[in-house]
């Protein structure tokens, strides 16, 4: 499966959707909906940094895909009144790639590195003195004649974003003064986001229609906005352009997104665990082979929402479906589930 082909995939949008997303993306903390703790803390840190005429401390933002890490990075630059230069970990293959970005920064600018956990070790080593001392160590020459020179850099703010904070090395993680975790959004916050996006796009949308889209958006703004665009297509062709609860329900059912926000891939994963592995426990590699998927797709794309909603739990012996999965498909709950631990007990346990 190509992740971007899923309507409810939270991975990066396609080129045309990226243009539309930029149009509806909030540009200030005042317009930033949800994540109240993150918003309040960042407002405080930014106000303090501006009051001292300093650059904001280096900031790490992590959480599942589609929750607004890039949006928050752009808001930080906007609120600080500085420019932002964006790149991603896989793009920075050589130290020279990073050096070119750093030497072109103006004082207090923001350097945003998406997927920062994918930085190569050699590039990461160059980043350490840049973050800590605002200096760049560069090797000149080769062999015995090689020597290191130090270049002073203007004070800047590094904003790193990652979906896998656990893959960051300790030296890199320790150099971030501010660490923010983005959580899945509530349905109410998503409904507000959908209504705001519809207003910007000029779409007639009832509050009930916004709520119907929001509750199937898997707690993710990117998915909510993507569903809104597809429901708009349906409404323009079959409902005179007006999005009501009934229209949204018909459109999303046609798109195979059920009332819990599951698509065929989610249902396939759950049914495979129930039918082929007796509900688990099953190792992630065995599960990946059974549904012909990559391990990282299960861990980064499919699992997070299913775990957060209590349909799957991780135990020391592997993945296990909960009674909610059986109820979702109208199946009889095995008697052994009555003896299983509560869903939250093993969510953070290490898989074998």
UniProtKB/Swiss-Prot annotation:
InterPro entries: AAA+_ATPase, AAA_lid_4, DNA_helicase_Holl-junc_RuvB, P-loop_NTPase, RuvB-like_N, RuvB_C, WH-like_DNA-bd_sf, WH_DNA-bd_sf. Residues 186-256 are annotated as: Small ATPAse domain (RuvB-S). This is Holliday junction branch migration complex subunit RuvB. It comes from the Bacteria. The lineage of its organism: Bacteria, Pseudomonadati, Pseudomonadota, Gammaproteobacteria, Pseudomonadales. HAMAP family: DNA_HJ_migration_RuvB (MF_00016). Its EC number is 3.6.4.-. ATP binds at residues 24-25, 66, 69-71, 132-134, 175, 185, 222. It catalyses: ATP + H2O = ADP + phosphate + H(+). Has 3 domains, the large (RuvB-L) and small ATPase (RuvB-S) domains and the C-terminal head (RuvB-H) domain. The head domain binds DNA, while the ATPase domains jointly bind ATP, ADP or are empty depending on the state of the subunit in the translocation cycle. During a single DNA translocation step the structure of each domain remains the same, but their relative positions change. It comes from Pseudomonas fluorescens (strain SBW25). Residues 4-185 are annotated as: Large ATPase domain (RuvB-L). It is found in: Cytoplasm. Belongs to the RuvB family.
């Amino acid at each position: 499966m190509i992740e971007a082909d899923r309507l409810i995939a939270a991975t990066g949008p396609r080129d045309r959707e990226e243009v539309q997303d930029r149009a509806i993306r909030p540009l200030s903390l005042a317009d930033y909906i949800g994540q109240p703790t993150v918003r309040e803390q960042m407002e405080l840190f930014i106000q303090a940094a501006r009051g001292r005429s300093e650059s904001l401390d280096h900031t790490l933002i992590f959480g599942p895909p589609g929750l607004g890490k890039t949006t928050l990075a752009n808001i930080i630059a906007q609120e600080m009144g500085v420019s932002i230069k964006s790149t991603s970990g896989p793009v920075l293959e050589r130290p020279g790639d990073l050096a070119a970005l750093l030497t072109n920064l103006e004082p207090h600018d923001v350097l945003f590195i998406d997927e920062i956990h994918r930085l190569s070790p050699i590039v990461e080593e160059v980043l350490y003195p840049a973050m800590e001392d605002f200096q760049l160590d560069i090797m000149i020459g080769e062999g015995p004649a090689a020597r290191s020179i130090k270049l002073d850099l203007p004070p800047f703010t590094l904003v790193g974003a990652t979906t896998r904070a656990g893959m960051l090395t300790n030296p890199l993680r320790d150099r971030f003064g501010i660490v923010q975790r983005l959580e899945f959004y509530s349905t109410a916050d998503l409904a507000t986001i959908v209504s705001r996006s519809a207003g910007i796009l000029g779409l007639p949308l009832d509050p009930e229609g916004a709520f119907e889209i929001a509750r199937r958006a898997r707690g993710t703004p990117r998915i909510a906005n993507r569903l809104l665009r597809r429901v708009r297509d349906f409404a323009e062709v079959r409902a005179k352009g007006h999005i009501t609860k009934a229209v949204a329900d018909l459109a999303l059912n046609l798109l195979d997104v059920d009332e819990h926000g599951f698509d065929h891939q989610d249902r396939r994963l759950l049914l495979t665990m129930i039918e082929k592995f007796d509900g688990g426990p099953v190792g992630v590699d065995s599960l990946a082979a059974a549904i012909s998927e990559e391990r990282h797709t299960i861990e980064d794309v499919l699992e997070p929402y299913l775990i957060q909603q209590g349909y799957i739990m991780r135990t020391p012996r592997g993945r296990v479906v909960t009674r909610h999965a059986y109820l979702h498909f109208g199946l009889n709950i095995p008697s052994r589930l009555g003896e299983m631990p509560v869903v939250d007990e093993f969510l953070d346990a290490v898989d074998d």
